[in-house]
Amino acid sequence: MTRFIPPATEVLIVADCWQAEAEAEAIVLRAIEAAAAMTDADTADAELAVMLTDDAGVQTLNANWRGIDKPTNVLSFPALQPEGDAPDDAPKMLGDIAIAYQTTRREADDEGKPFDHHLSHLAVHGFLHLVGYDHEKDAEAEAMESLEREILAQLGVPDPYADQDRVN
């Protein structure tokens, strides 16, 4: 039996606004581990980074990488895997996730959700993008949202889609 090994996750707090959320790093780490445990992704010897930034930081990333000059709640950047064989001891890079504080806070407040629940959802959502899930087509969206619900239920977070549209 193979033992589950979560990915090594580095959480980088790059905007002072996150200092108001003392548990943000622990929330993100718990959400990533839960998501990794419930997917078929091989996360042993894998690494990813989560950047907790502000709306301006996410807006810059969104403009540079997606051509959309506005902030959003979460962005995921799956790592390109190198061609050829990597050294046996090289970690597998899953990619990077960026989460915008002001948008996350505003959405949680507008939807009457606890901030930690919404942050958990965005971390799970971002991780699923790194391991190949998407929501461009209806069938993909249904599969991704169903898995998000299952993962979040394991974390004690209610269905995030019960009263809203999909995460961008």
Curated annotation (Swiss-Prot):
Family: Belongs to the endoribonuclease YbeY family.
Keywords per UniProt: Cytoplasm, Endonuclease, Hydrolase, Metal-binding, Nuclease, Ribosome biogenesis, rRNA processing, Zinc
Protein encoded by which gene: ybeY
Protein name: Endoribonuclease YbeY
Role description: Single strand-specific metallo-endoribonuclease involved in late-stage 70S ribosome quality control and in maturation of the 3' terminus of the 16S rRNA.
GO biological process terms, semicolon-separated: rRNA processing
GO cellular component, one term: cytoplasm
InterPro entries recorded: MetalPrtase_cat_dom_sf_prd, YbeY, YbeY_CS
Residues reported in the UniProt entry to bind Zn(2+): 125, 129, 135
SUPFAM superfamilies in the cross-refs: Metalloproteases ('zincins'), catalytic domain (SSF55486)
